[in-house]
Amino acid sequence: MSTESMIRDVELAEEALPKKMGGLQNSRRCLCLSLFSFLLVAGATTLFCLLNFGVIGPNKEEKFPNGLPLISSMAQTLTLRSSSQNSSDKPVAHVVANHQAEEQLEWLSQRANALLANGMDLKDNQLVVPADGLYLIYSQVLFKGQGCPDYVLLTHTVSRFAISYQEKVSLLSAIKSPCPKDTPEGAELKPWYEPMYLGGVFQLEKGDLLSAEVNLPKYLDITESGQVYFGVIAL
């Protein structure tokens, strides 16, 4: 073999070596990318499974027995307070309107779906609080009428007569009018209905008196049970 041939072979070998090295590097790069993609997909799949089956992640949302979530801190607080005591020994009252009373709102406890328990009492149309504590107070009324010969303004109020300072104060109140201020003369006398619901949580003292009143009892619809009521629940 001549010297020129040997030199030519060496040059060809030097030219082929970078190509082989480049091909090897490309193969390694593809292998690394493939491995990284596989690990990424596997990790995401594993994380999804763990979250889906509740192995990791935040605690599941608490729910009421009827399936409604506890969406407020107040509801969570009330639930914790209620569960910390035996509900059977808590003061509770639910009174209903006397449908035989004419043009007045009289509360009765000796009726179906009404009760006084664990120290609660009804005296002079007022509920008597038996012990200091946090109480849920609620009341609903339903007004009805026929047409609007005059401007009608309806009010519904829950009040507390505090034993500590001997004064009656309003705890909850609502005002509504079923009629426009200006009723056209000769307008058709259409029937109307106006419900009002009040509810709130209050710190009460033993001996406090609670009352639920309306300004125009003649418009009350008390023909059906469950439409007008007043209640207190210790929390």
UniProtKB/Swiss-Prot annotation:
Subcellular location: Cell membrane
Protein induction: Induced by lipopolysaccharides.
Record site feature (Cleavage), residues: S34, L35, L39, L40, C49, L50, L51, N52, T79, L80
Post-translational events: The soluble form derives from the membrane form by proteolytic processing. The membrane-bound form is further proteolytically processed by SPPL2A or SPPL2B through regulated intramembrane proteolysis producing TNF intracellular domains (ICD1 and ICD2) released in the cytosol and TNF C-domain 1 and C-domain 2 secreted into the extracellular space. The membrane form, but not the soluble form, is phosphorylated on serine residues. Dephosphorylation of the membrane form occurs by binding to soluble TNFRSF1A/TNFR1.
Predominant subcellular localization, coarse grouping: membrane
Modified residues (Phosphoserine): S2
Gene3D superfamilies for this protein: 2.60.120.40
GO aspect biological process, one term: positive regulation of leukocyte adhesion to arterial endothelial cell
GO terms for MF: cytokine activity; death receptor agonist activity; identical protein binding; protease binding; receptor ligand activity; transcription cis-regulatory region binding; tumor necrosis factor receptor binding
InterPro entries recorded: TNF (IPR006053), TNF_alpha (IPR002959), TNF_CS (IPR021184), TNF_dom (IPR006052), Tumour_necrosis_fac-like_dom (IPR008983)
Ranges for domain THD: 91-235
Record topological domains on the Extracellular side: 57-235
Glycan-carrying positions: S83, N86
Record key words, sorted: Cell membrane, Cytokine, Disulfide bond, Glycoprotein, Lipoprotein, Membrane, Myristate, Phosphoprotein, Secreted, Signal-anchor, Transmembrane, Transmembrane helix
TM spans (from-to): 36-56
Gene Ontology CC terms: cell surface; external side of plasma membrane; extracellular region; extracellular space; membrane raft; neuronal cell body; phagocytic cup; plasma membrane
Lipidation positions, renumbered (N6-myristoyl lysine): K19, K20
Keyword Glycoprotein: yes
Disulfide bonds: C148-C179
Membrane topology: Single-pass type II membrane protein
Matching Pfam families: TNF
CDD domains xrefs: TNF
Function: Cytokine that binds to TNFRSF1A/TNFR1 and TNFRSF1B/TNFBR. It is mainly secreted by macrophages and can induce cell death of certain tumor cell lines. It is potent pyrogen causing fever by direct action or by stimulation of interleukin-1 secretion and is implicated in the induction of cachexia, Under certain conditions it can stimulate cell proliferation and induce cell differentiation. Induces insulin resistance in adipocytes via inhibition of insulin-induced IRS1 tyrosine phosphorylation and insulin-induced glucose uptake. The TNF intracellular domain (ICD) form induces IL12 production in dendritic cells.
Family to which this protein belongs: Belongs to the tumor necrosis factor family.
Subunit details: Homotrimer. Interacts with SPPL2B.
Protein name, UniProt field: Tumor necrosis factor
Originating species: Rattus norvegicus
